[in-house]
Amino acid sequence: MASSPPKKTLNSQSSSLSRPPQAVKFGRRTSSGRIVSLSRDDDMDVSGDYSGQNDYINYTVLMPPTPDNQPAGSSGSTSESKGDANRGGGGGDGPKMGNKLERRLSVMKSNNKSMLLRSQTGDFDHNRWLFESKGKYGIGNAFWSEEDDTYDGGVSKSDFLDKPWKPLTRKVQIPAKILSPYRLLIVIRLVIVFFFLWWRITNPNEDAMWLWGLSIVCEIWFAFSWILDILPKLNPINRATDLAALHDKFEQPSPSNPTGRSDLPGVDVFVSTADPEKEPPLVTANTLLSILAVDYPIEKLSAYISDDGGAILTFEAMAEAVRFAEYWVPFCRKHDIEPRNPDSYFSIKKDPTKNKKRQDFVKDRRWIKREYDEFKVRINGLPEQIKKRAEQFNMREELKEKRIAREKNGGVLPPDGVEVVKATWMADGTHWPGTWFEPKPDHSKGDHAGILQIMSKVPDLEPVMGGPNEGALDFTGIDIRVPMFAYVSREKRPGFDHNKKAGAMNGMVRASAILSNGAFILNLDCDHYIYNSKAIKEGMCFMMDRGGDRICYIQFPQRFEGIDPSDRYANHNTVFFDGNMRALDGLQGPVYVGTGCMFRRYALYGFNPPRANEYSGVFGQEKAPAMHVRTQSQASQTSQASDLESDTQPLNDDPDLGLPKKFGNSTMFTDTIPVAEYQGRPLADHMSVKNGRPPGALLLPRPPLDAPTVAEAIAVISCWYEDNTEWGDRIGWIYGSVTEDVVTGYRMHNRGWRSVYCITKRDAFRGTAPINLTDRLHQVLRWATGSVEIFFSKNNAMFATRRLKFLQRVAYLNVGIYPFTSIFLVVYCFLPALCLFSGKFIVQSLDIHFLSYLLCITVTLTLISLLEVKWSGIGLEEWWRNEQFWLIGGTSAHLAAVVQGLLKVIAGIEISFTLTSKASGEDEDDIFADLYIVKWTGLFIMPLTIIIVNLVAIVIGASRTIYSVIPQWGKLMGGIFFSLWVLTHMYPFAKGLMGRRGKVPTIVYVWSGLVSITVSLLWITISPPDDVSGSGGISV
């Protein structure tokens, strides 16, 4: 219970005053503690220089009654007014002073009433506290008395003085000097492209209609694709968070929270993995350690790992990680370590002692480094240890079975021998319930029981301080608690569709709801660790800010380590993460990209946003009342309630809530839904905060886990639980696409939710990306395949509801359409070669109109790109790498995805592109060795063909010009220019085929020879050898 300040009985005369109390509006605390009024006759704009200063505060002072039981400034004699003014420290004549008091101290007549009310929270009355104690007052100033400045509990009264209400986040608009020209150039280029296409259509090339037709179709599609891509970029914004304000609101002593215990909501962190052979357990363990050591209230944090393969190797690696976390987590807190992934921390090249103040840091770091090296040895030795254990137990079982068989068969073994199942064993001598090394029925990747193990229990509510340990670290005064951690592997059985990663995530959503029920869920891949220990708090600033209850998720940018310095294949993808995503943040929000995303649990459950307001307009910023679909229970309400639009969506008004057909038959799970919704609300500490919760509502301890709770959590991850429910259809991660992340985010936006893009000063998360060309192309192939699936499904943005904003709809439409650009891109890459082969061109002649349009389009595109680079903060080299890989991926992976999608939709045929050969790196110590490995795949065929065809075309074009009677060198250069444009974009691809030191695989020579012969035969057919007198290239 919060202790209250001493109370005294108010004068009955003062309580009977009919007029509202007068108050000082605005003040500034001086160095001596005195607060000076800054009120003036005119209203002060608090949004200027004063609003952000810590020494300016809003406060309300109740003015005591005058001796005749009338408030100051009421009607009375002049002498009384003057006397009262003089006693307050003022001067001047009576009537003048009385009028000034009315102007300066009256709150009810001020237009800044909201400024005063916004700092009043709860039922705590600072006015009564001030004037029922020994506080002093005066005209234009107020201060606390020096004596008795604390009350029972030892908290200073000044700590509870009304402070200015501070938002937790703010929008940082792109400067108009950058954004306005950017928008203007987009409009100008749009007009130029329109007139260029009109000119191209009305001026066909009669000499080569087939070239003209192919080119004009491609150019129209490119214009359409460019519009889809550029329109969502019209309103980019930046955002900033205020972690100090978050700390003051949720973790500082207050009247509702006198102990300063954290009032932040709970967060559940999900880590997903499936195969320890492809995703090394050491990498997953380091990710887990970075989560357990994150800077967030320990009792509010829970971590879960979803092992969809049910591997004992992952299970025991996580157990080892939890044991190491007992030292690693307090070490990070003691010395404020960043990053808190031990492998990344010990790999940092800079001085580790920088900014470290504790004298025992070097000793502690040396000790924990030695412990981590031993931890790595144990993790790396787990596969062999588990196999040896299995062999020992299996041998024991075999001897046991033979002994039993001899006893039953008269002392001899049966003729058929004794069969003993080669099982995988746990350390306690029991069978591993998951996947065995030698798969058997009930023990394979697609057929095993559900597993749930609480490896780290629910921490105590109060901090547990460590002490000095001989031979270990000194954790005196350091909280040594570790957040709760659970290993989860859902049940899998033949005949059930497990829906890959999306199904595993939904299983964790249900299990975590029963075990911890964090109001927010952070989703990470096993190779993405927390690089910024305050990342969760950064995201919480948006969720807990005014209007945060309408945010469904916070998407963080993906940052990668281990990328080659030149970023040959655009692995950093900064154009997308710093450009496109930042622009979408100015609309309805960024798309969900699969990792580094913090969800509102309530939004994952398929509910609409809490306030039924729809936004219209180009940028989705204009509010308009939404169209409500009222149920019978809502229609039966009183007319008064019908006329008044509710700001929230009451859970008990949803007729489907809790029904098995929607969420399943677990009542324990459905009971957690309203709790998660309530805990995810922002604080109601401002008059403009709607659907908020009172301060101090989340201070109660979490109950310990008991056997029935764990049993229920196991039940909700069973393979049959989702049967006849809406999981995967409207609830949780959505099924039916290999890019379930994009579809899941789309469904939330389609219901009216908003998302936010959070770019932190220090990267929030970091992960790994494939630097090998083949692996990179297969990654892009998976993304593009998912986009094609979206285009041919009900998740196409063309079928979205009106809650999806216009430009957001355009962005999602582009997500489904962009792979189809590959068809036209491939054709356009062959056009320069076809022009050189045929001696024709896409236009009748290179006249002034064509060259002028080409120049204007090129200049405007360059200027738009430069301004985009400016507001997004990406580098020119990054932009160029992205352009290069756009062409490489567009002519390979995107084209393959379109072929796959069309065959699947039209004929029901599924084609997969897999690796056919692998090579190993020559230098295992080279971290970029994988960059030089050449793994042949069918995705190489089209880009390789484009390169060879254009090279041969240049040779043929040059030969025709050299041996012609009248060489046309200028025309040849014009034809070669477009081929070189293609080849320049293909340079990283060609360099990747060379491998290390230019070693080209034999298969590349084979394909080059085949393509060259084919092209030569084609040229001979088109242009017979005896025609050597023609001009070489383009006819003018």
From Swiss-Prot:
Protein source organism: Arabidopsis thaliana (Mouse-ear cress)
Transmembrane residue ranges: 178-198, 208-228, 817-837, 848-868, 895-915, 938-958, 962-982, 1002-1022
Stretch list, region Disordered: 1-99, 626-665
Keyword Transferase included in the entry's annotation: yes
GO MF annotation: an example: cellulose synthase (UDP-forming) activity
Protein localization: Golgi apparatus membrane
Stated name of the protein: Cellulose synthase-like protein D1
Keyword set includes Cell wall biogenesis/degradation: yes
E.C. number(s) listed in UniProt: 2.4.1.-
Record keywords: Cell wall biogenesis/degradation, Glycosyltransferase, Golgi apparatus, Membrane, Transferase, Transmembrane, Transmembrane helix
Swiss-Prot/TrEMBL GO biological process terms: cell wall organization; cellulose biosynthetic process; pollen germination
Record field: compositional bias (Polar residues): 9-19, 69-80
Biological function: Thought to be a Golgi-localized beta-glycan synthase that polymerize the backbones of noncellulosic polysaccharides (hemicelluloses) of plant cell wall.
Alphabetical list of PANTHER family matching this protein: X-BOX TRANSCRIPTION FACTOR-RELATED
